From Swiss-Prot:
<feature type="region of interest" description="Domain II">
    <location>
        <begin position="65"/>
        <end position="142"/>
    </location>
</feature>
<dbReference type="Pfam" id="PF01330">
    <property type="entry name" value="RuvA_N"/>
</dbReference>
<dbReference type="GO" id="GO:0006281">
    <property type="term" value="P:DNA repair"/>
</dbReference>
<keyword id="KW-0233">DNA recombination</keyword>
<dbReference type="InterPro" id="IPR036267">
    <property type="entry name" value="RuvA_C_sf"/>
</dbReference>
<keyword id="KW-0227">DNA damage</keyword>
<dbReference type="InterPro" id="IPR013849">
    <property type="entry name" value="DNA_helicase_Holl-junc_RuvA_I"/>
</dbReference>
<feature type="region of interest" description="Domain I">
    <location>
        <begin position="1"/>
        <end position="64"/>
    </location>
</feature>
<dbReference type="GO" id="GO:0009432">
    <property type="term" value="P:SOS response"/>
</dbReference>
<dbReference type="GO" id="GO:0006310">
    <property type="term" value="P:DNA recombination"/>
</dbReference>
<protein>
    <recommendedName>
        <fullName>Holliday junction branch migration complex subunit RuvA</fullName>
    </recommendedName>
</protein>
<dbReference type="InterPro" id="IPR012340">
    <property type="entry name" value="NA-bd_OB-fold"/>
</dbReference>
<comment type="similarity">
    <text>Belongs to the RuvA family.</text>
</comment>
<dbReference type="InterPro" id="IPR003583">
    <property type="entry name" value="Hlx-hairpin-Hlx_DNA-bd_motif"/>
</dbReference>
<keyword id="KW-0234">DNA repair</keyword>
<feature type="region of interest" description="Domain III">
    <location>
        <begin position="156"/>
        <end position="204"/>
    </location>
</feature>
<dbReference type="GO" id="GO:0009379">
    <property type="term" value="C:Holliday junction helicase complex"/>
</dbReference>
Amino acid sequence: MIGRLRGIILEKQPPLVLLETNGVGYEVQLPMTCFYELPELGQEAIIFTQFVVREDAQLLYGFNNKQERALFRELIKVNGVGPKLALAILSGMSAQQFVGAVEREDITTLVKLPGVGKKTAERLVVEMKDRFKGLNGDLFNNTGDISLPTASPQTSDADIEAEAASALVALGYKPQEASRLVSKIAKPGADCETLIRDALRAAL
């Protein structure tokens, strides 16, 4: 199983990154909370991975540290939560925020995440609460604001907004809802990652 990759970032298309390691390009899907922290194109990155095999695909999910990966592994053990939904959950809020919502049994906040209904939110609270005790506390430290790159002047605001909406759809939002969220927070000159982050915050 592939558990860790170290290589050069060739492409970034939220939530997907293409990482070249020893001449091989690996496509890795990351939660947006991890995607924001990636280095720029052409720079080296270290990604901790979870390899998932389905009938129709073999997928790699990536994380910035072992603790985030551990939380992802626990999430996909919950009945009704697959890798795609786990990715959406960890994109919609940080690990620290998710843990806080579960410990407070905050169903109202959890159901605002894409793909999470009331029953799923209740299962998350019941099944995840006791599992946090076995995870490293470093996972829940607040790392502060993340500095994001500015948008390229060659890319139009409309193209950036379309890319952000496409990323939200990949995370589980319906196309109309994704477009509505992006339109709500769009501002001239904003880059794609900022729009995605602001849209996810607005959804909560």
